[in-house]
């Protein structure tokens, strides 16, 4: 989280990590898309990672986002993650560069060969303007350190195809908390969700625990609650209904009394009182009850 003046808010970050642990999440991803890695300095990114590992070590697995414009930069962040005891690393293909599928494979191969940590491939077409094909994901699964794929394409059919192609080889994280997702997991073993900000954790954690325990009726109950939250806040392409995704998320967290902090430029804060009231009403309808409906500055 950032303070209102744009500085890194270390105390809020520690409090947020403790909140995630209280929610019994199964892992924490640091410096991903929601973590605004693009507006942090290298020193800040390393500090954020160090705090997360120190706060959660031994309790919750910590994966560090290494997103950057070059493989060399990713390697440096990956080496730092290994040195502080992180459990794994994640990155998208380089943004803006529009690499080919062969270039995507070469990029991940460089990272996998250089950093001795479990590696998660992050497919995020909306943020990178490239979509990693299933064939390329199959090739990447052959790299020794690649253990998982985070598919944020928003394409449910492709996620199902990815799960089928990678079953028994690497884990696949996508959007599975719905009836179709349950069917995909039952058939191919999708591993879970990685949600920005953890707003859905009160519904997502018990959903997966019920599913893994074989209690499908209870899983469907939690799924319905989670789906309601998503429908109220998120569009099918992972854009958000009330503001840009991270601005909306942080405003929602503040409304709920959570230490979400503020965004940094180029993102703008969600401050319009009428929009905040609508966001607060959506949270309340989803079963997450705001502490305040007057503003998002708590």
Language-model region placement:
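Active-site beta->alpha loop and helix N-cap motifs at the rims of alpha/beta catalytic domains
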Residues: 1-131, 268
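Short, amphipathic alpha-helical "lid/cap" segments that border enzyme active or binding sites
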Residues: 10, 14-17, 134, 273-283
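A general structural signal for well-ordered alpha-helical segments in protein cores
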Residues: 13, 45, 49, 74, ...
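Short, solvent-exposed alpha-helical surface patches in well-structured domains
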Residues: 15, 47, 139, 218-222, ...
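Short Gly/charged-rich anion-binding patches and loops
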Residues: 15, 76, 106-107, 135-136, ...
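Alpha-helical structural signal in soluble globular domains
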Residues: 47, 51-56, 80, 84, ...
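Catalytic alpha/beta core domains of metabolic enzymes, predominantly
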Residues: 113, 125-235
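Structured C-terminal cap/extension of enzyme domains
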Residues: 181-298
């Amino acid at each position: 989280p950032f303070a209102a003046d744009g500085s890194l808010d270390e105390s809020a970050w520690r409090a947020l990590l403790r909140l995630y642990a209280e929610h019994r999440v199964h892992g924490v991803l640091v410096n991903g898309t929601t973590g605004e890695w693009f507006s942090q300095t290298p020193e800040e990114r390393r500090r954020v990672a160090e705090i997360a590992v120190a706060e959660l070590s031994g309790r919750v697995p910590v994966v560090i986002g290494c997103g950057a414009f070059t493989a060399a930069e990713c390697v440096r962040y990956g080496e730092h993650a290994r040195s502080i005891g992180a459990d794994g690393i994640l990155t998208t293909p380089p943004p803006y560069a529009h690499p080919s599928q062969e270039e995507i494979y070469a990029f991940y191969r460089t990272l996998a060969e250089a950093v001795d940590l479990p590696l998660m491939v992050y497919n995020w077409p909306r943020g990178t303007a490239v979509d990693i094909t299933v064939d390329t994901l199959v090739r990447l699964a052959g790299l020794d350190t690649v253990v998982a794929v985070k598919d944020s394409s928003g394409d449910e059919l492709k996620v199902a195809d990815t799960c089928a192609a990678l079953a028994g080889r690497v884990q696949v994280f996508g959007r599975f908390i719905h009836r179709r997702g349950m069917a995909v997991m039952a058939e191919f073993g999708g591993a879970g969700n990685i949600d920005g900000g953890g707003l859905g954790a009160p519904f997502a954690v018990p959903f997966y625990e019920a599913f893994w325990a074989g209690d499908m009726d209870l899983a469907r109950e939690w799924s319905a609650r989670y789906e309601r939250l998503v429908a109220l806040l998120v569009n099918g392409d992972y854009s958000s209904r009330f503001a840009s995704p991270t601005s909306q998320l942080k405003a929602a967290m503040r409304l709920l009394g959570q230490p979400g902090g503020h965004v940094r430029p180029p993102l703008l804060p969600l401050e319009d009182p009428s929009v905040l009231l609508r966001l607060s009403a959506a949270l309340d309808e989803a079963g997450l009850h705001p502490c305040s409906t007057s503003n998002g500055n708590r």
